[in-house]
């Protein structure tokens, strides 16, 4: 999950945190093969598309969006991904 009051801000923040972790592990977003997105309101996923397209480029990884409650109501999106080494 990321910081911010909107789903867009939290999406950007989460991706920045994840990018740092992926790069520290010796990989990159170009090597991401799978992403899971968890949102309490599936309708909020659409505003994230431009942010995700910018992050993953022309060949995005396989993805699943799950509508579910998150640990705290202030969180609008949680992102989980798998990247190759």
Language-model region placement:
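Short, polar/acidic, helix-capping and beta-turn segments at strand->helix junctions
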Residues: 1-85
């Amino acid at each position: 999950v990321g910081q911010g009051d909107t789903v867009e801000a939290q999406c950007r923040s989460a991706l920045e945190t994840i990018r740092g972790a992926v790069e520290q592990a010796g990989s990159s977003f170009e090597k991401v093969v799978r992403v899971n997105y968890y949102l309490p309101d599936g309708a909020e996923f659409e505003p994230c598309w431009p942010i995700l397209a910018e992050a993953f480029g022309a060949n995005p990884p396989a993805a699943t969006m799950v509508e579910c409650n998150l640990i705290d109501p202030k969180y609008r999106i949680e992102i989980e991904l798998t990247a190759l080494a």
